[in-house]
């Protein structure tokens, strides 16, 4: 109404891109049954891109699987992440792909946004933001992924870097006075 100071919500058009009535009947994430991966996520797109072909042969990735890329600095982890994102959006267009960048340089964020498909969600928290923001953005992405899974969607989250997220959590918690290996406070 025009004379109201604060406008009220009149009707809901969509919930996570779907009909609001279907949202009422969704199964909540904690009630879902975890299963072992039984469908392979094919990453190879072109014969010239060897890294994704090698991943398909040596370390195949399946729906429902968690993985970790461990390599020294400047080894090409981010390049591999971009190739994986492009492969997933090409080979599995029905899956929702979210790229989470924690504590990255703004230039790196722009590079990844420009190098992936437009339907890929790139969510970032750059290095000039406080650690609380890194945690908040990461938890929002996790919640978004869980809501989409509740709507029976396949969701893939690619994250760079879990080390920096762990560091942000470590900076936010109050210190206990004890230190584990790697400078992590066990509080």
Residue ranges with predicted function:
Residues 24-27, 33, 46-53, 164, ...:
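Short, functionally important structural connectors and interaction interfaces within domains
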Residues 4-5, 64-67, 71, 76, ...:
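Glycine-centered flexibility sites
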Residues 15-20, 37, 63-66, 89-93, ...:
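Non-catalytic alpha-helical coupling and interface elements of nucleotide-dependent molecular machines
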Residues 1-45, 93:
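Acidic-enriched and Gly/Ser
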Residues 31-138:
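Phosphate-binding glycine-rich loops and their immediate beta-loop-alpha structural context
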Residues 109, 115-123, 127, 131-142, ...:
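Conserved P-loop NTPase nucleotide-binding/switch module
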């Amino acid at each position: 109404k025009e004379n109201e100071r604060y406008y009220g919500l009149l009707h809901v058009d969509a919930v996570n891109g779907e009909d609001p009535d279907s949202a009422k009947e969704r199964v909540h994430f904690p009630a879902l049954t975890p299963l072992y991966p039984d469908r392979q996520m094919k990453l190879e797109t072109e014969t010239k891109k060897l890294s994704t072909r090698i991943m398909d042969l040596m370390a195949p990735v399946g729906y429902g699987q968690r993985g970790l890329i461990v390599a020294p600095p400047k080894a090409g982890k981010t390049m591999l992440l971009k190739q994986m994102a492009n492969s997933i959006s090409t080979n599995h267009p029905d899956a929702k792909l979210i790229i989470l960048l924690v504590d990255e340089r703004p230039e790196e964020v722009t590079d990844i946004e420009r190098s992936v498909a437009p339907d890929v969600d790139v969510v970032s928290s750059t290095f000039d933001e406080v650690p609380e923001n890194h945690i908040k953005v990461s938890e929002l992405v996790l919640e978004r992924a869980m809501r989409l899974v509740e709507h029976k969607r396949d969701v893939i989250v690619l994250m760079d870097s879990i080390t920096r997220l762990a560091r942000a959590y470590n900076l936010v918690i109050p210190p206990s006075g004890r230190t584990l290996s790697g400078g992590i406070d066990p509080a």
